[in-house]
Amino acid sequence: FFYINSTGSANVRKNGDYVSNMIELAGGKYVPEDTGESDNALSTMNMQMEDFYNAAQSADILIYNSAIEGEITSIDELLAKNSLFAQFDAVKKGNVYCTGKNFFQESTGMAEFVEDMHNVLGDADADLTYLKKLN
């Protein structure tokens, strides 16, 4: 669960954050793992792209957070942000999803997000509420 900010860094949620917890509730494993617990009040941190690659290159699924820097609609748009994404396993397999712009505005949707994640992780062909598969 990340986005690429204006400086080209990957902004990720820290371990123990509610988003990483929801991914784990759905049966997934949040990557990157080495973000540490919240040392400060911020629930996010920036990672240099090379560090993000080392942490997430072999992830089965990538989820791009479109709520912050704008929605992306294709894997090509992700590759335009950094060509290194072409080497990620999830990109090679077409397992890239994004959130909608409204993701953080609907706090009552946590259960639906967990359900979306569960369906994505289980390869269920279900309608998704907060996630959209990129082509």
Predicted regions span which residues?
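Loop/turn elements at helix/coil->beta-strand transitions in domains of secreted/extracellular proteins
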Residues: 1, 27-29, 57-61, 92-95
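Second-shell loop/turn segments in exported
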Residues: 6-13, 38-42, 100-107
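His/Asp/Glu-enriched short active-site or ligand-binding loop at hydrolase and phosphoryl-transfer sites
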Residues: 18-42, 63-66
